Amino acid sequence: MKKIIVLLLPLILLMCVSGHAENDPEGLCALAARHGFRLGSCLSFNQMRDQKYLDILKAHFNSVTMTNEMKAYTLLDERASRGAADGMPVMNYAMADAMVGWARNNGLAVRGHTLVWDAYMCDWYFHEGYDPKQPYADQETVRKRTEYYIHEVITHFEEKFPGTVYCWDVVNEAVADSAGEYAPGDARHLRLKRSGADNLFQKYMGDDYVALAFLYARDTVEQLGADIDLYYNDYNAFFGDKAAAILALADSVNTFAPDGNGGFRKLMDGVGMQGYIGGYGTQQGCLEDGYPDMIRSAILGYHEKGLKVQITEMAVRNFEKEQARRHAEYYAELFRVFTALNTPEGNPLNCVAIWALTDDPTAPKGSYTYSLNSPYGGLLDEKLGVKDAFRLVENVLRGDE
């Protein structure tokens, strides 16, 4: 009897760990690489203390996006900027450096996210002397600050962690959705307002702020001789009207800077489709049959215009625990779309980054996290155990269906 128990023990132990994603023998990212795209997820500074989560990132992903720590409102140092002798902004990279350093040391490439985003941006950045009690600065001053900021941030990470940051979301969410948020007749739907508040980049840099940001980024990348792609990133990018506006914006950016040979410099390499799929805060609109084909068509549409495509913040929303199997099948269908896109004739999709990696059933109903990612939208459960969604996606990537 003891001999039987001893023989069975390794099998029992294997069964016990098989439900944990960090113990899978072959990572999902290695399987995705067979189909020509990276597989990514996200990381917050607080998660740097969660070793199990870090182990899952190392096991299954080869790209990581910092949720907030590489954004301007995190990097900018108000007090130091006010004291800067040259009048240029000062950044504090402590948190971001720790995270990018971890990624480098563990073999993950980094999506830089994001250089210019009007939402949550520090108001003081736009004032004379960085002092909110002073008037807003003039256009030339704000443009110089932004050029300096973009140059310094890209340069910092490339020189400190060479080759680790492989792309940047240069501008985030500059295309508005609703009438009144953009000027009538503007095919780009360039955002003037967000929830009633002014887009301060547009207001104080001008209508060319997106193109200027890409120009500043392109100049920096070329000066560094770095292999870094430059992306425009937005939500709802697979809906027809939004996609048309994004394409109009991309065309305006890529016809902005003459190349000296009668053409234009290509400033924007690609489009990041955020990939929040389903209703915001509600099951209505979730797991709808038509979305996978819409996503496929949008990716091909961007690719046909010479733009690379990444899915940058994917959350396959599900607010009902009872829909777990349907959610898993839906996730698998999305990955069937992704794996079929890249062929020897073309490679339109180069990364899929999953934002809602884990379930979060304790998120308060109506909260931002609950509404954005949904409580049951993960590949993993709240204890980081694998769900049917994980296994079905794995099967698609393996070709084991």
Residues of each region from the PLM?
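Sec-dependent signal peptide cleavage junction
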Residues: 15-23
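Boundary/entry segment of secreted carbohydrate-active catalytic domains
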Residues: 22-63, 67-69
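Short, acidic/polar
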Residues: 44-60, 146-156, 242-258, 295, ...
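Substrate-binding cleft and catalytic face of glycoside hydrolase catalytic domains
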Residues: 29, 59-80, 86, 91-237, ...
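Aromatic-rich peripheral "rim/lid" segments of glycoside hydrolase catalytic domains that contact
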Residues: 25, 76, 142, 156-160, ...
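Bacterial N-terminal signal peptides
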Residues: 8-15
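Glycoside hydrolase catalytic-domain groove-lining segments
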Residues: 93-94, 98-101, 105, 203-233, ...
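Acidic-and-aromatic substrate-binding clefts and catalytic sites of carbohydrate-active enzymes
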Residues: 41-54, 73-76, 81, 87-94, ...
